[in-house]
Amino acid sequence: VPKAENVNIKESEVSKITLEDYSTDVFSMKKPKGWNVEGAGTGIYYAIRVYDPQNTNNQVFLMLKIQPLLKSEASKNQWQNYYKLNSYNAQYKLFADAVVLENPTVENFYQKFNEIGTYVNSIEPTLATFKFPTLSNFTKLEEFESKASMKSVALDSKVLRGTFKGDSGKDGEGLFMASIVNFGNQYAGGADLLYYMAYDIMAITADKDEFINYKDILLESANSIQFNSNYVQKTIDDGNTQTKQALALNASIQKAFDSYMSAWESRQKSYDIMSQKQSDATLGYERVYDTETGDIYKAYNGFTDDYDGERYKSVT
């Protein structure tokens, strides 16, 4: 019978991905080797997506700002009427085609994310071919307060732990952040015609039962993103006051990272245990925890049958 100090267990494996330097005239970062990088947009409407071409659920996504997001179907109907009455002027199309965010929450934003991505592709030429993440059937598991740059002026600013189906139909899991800000209020015909704006948009994701293993490398990559100082200055010069607040760009990314770390520390470990058991079942492991430290390890199948000590217990 194995003794506690000589048991055949090992720490949970983390992905053996290595990071490499990557840079453009807009930003630089450390990206996972072999992964694709897309960067597109203009000014504060800039998006970055870093993803594994073999499995697009494995990704880092960041966008500085998205607007407009309408407040109601009644508002959208009004804008569509203005669009028709003004001979389909492109100025009104921006609003006539906009996505309705019934609830100004981070959860509703990600529930509508596929629709929002399609809309942005259609109205912003510099993002016309940008491949937004596919987040079908987005479901919130947990939510945490964020430390995001726009939190103080936001209606909602959260980090969500959520699940989704990716573009391959595979189940994914990740951490998702945004801040939803009200642009203002202007009523006509009983509808508020103004809109919400989304800032601090960032997601890190992987396959559902692998996210716990990918989290660290994804966070390290996301946290390494640095915007070129000339790009930041030009965008600040072109922007308004709120834009300037959001545009301490590199500080915003640090705040996003801090938000993620805080959220991860606060998470419900029960989700991790369920994910790990599912993952282990296909790999022929069983999961045990150290009763003295609380750390979780992988052991060979049948370990708990062989082991009669008290220190290591099966994770249930």
Placement of each model-derived feature along the sequence:
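Sequence-level motif detector for i,i+2 pairs with an aromatic at +2
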Residues: 14-19, 26, 155-157, 197
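Proline-anchored loop/turn motifs at beta-strand termini and strand-loop-strand connectors
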Residues: 24-42, 221-228
